[in-house]
Amino acid sequence: MLLDAIEARIIGCLLEKEVTTPDQYPLSLNALTLACNQKSSRAPVMDLSETQVQAGIDELTKKRLVSEQSGFGSRVVKYKHRFCNTEFSDLQLSSAQVAVLSLLLLRGPQTPGELRTRAGRQHDFKDIAEVEATLTALASRETPLVVQLPREPGKRESRFSLTIVEATTGMTTHSVASQVDERDDSRIAALEERVAQLEARLDALLLQTH
């Protein structure tokens, strides 16, 4: 399982909102797009369109990490994660582990101190030791989910990064934008091919009528 930057943002948002706004979860495409583009608690800040978020959802659905849920009597399709703690997932995690993974998905590499400070709405860590124990558990799995990065000069704590996200270090807005552009190009090419096919079929039908 390897996620690109957009897929990581989507999963992170779904994990976060499931805990912080359970009455609004699962999320509609519009709500999920707003969550992805939040100015606070996100690094880098993204400016994704609903089309781009939908493309990410489609990829995650193929990976069986997201599923649709239609509301009772509602036409709006909503989405929920199948990343962990579901009957479909092999990952069964504690609330502390989910909070840490969500923060790393949404903000990239962080120190234990940063994780404790930012996790308040998802899990109330009593001290740094609890955060470190959580990180150790995630790093010690048969397939590790996090890895400790070398300590940077002048820093007291090492940062921890996810092993399931592409280019977890040095992720920039530019690289995300490039990834988005590539997705747009592929979708446009597919649409152009579809239009050409429909035009050919229409021409064939017109010939048959004459």
Swiss-Prot record:
Taxonomy, superkingdom: Bacteria
InterPro entries found in the cross-reference section: DUF480, WH-like_DNA-bd_sf, WH_DNA-bd_sf
Pfam families listed in its UniProt record: DUF480
Gene3D superfamilies the UniProt entry points to: Winged helix-like DNA-binding domain superfamily/Winged helix DNA-binding domain
HAMAP family linked to this entry: UPF0502
Family statement: Belongs to the UPF0502 family.
Name of this chain's protein: UPF0502 protein Sama_1967
Organism: Shewanella amazonensis (strain ATCC BAA-1098 / SB2B)
Source taxonomy: Bacteria, Pseudomonadati, Pseudomonadota, Gammaproteobacteria, Alteromonadales
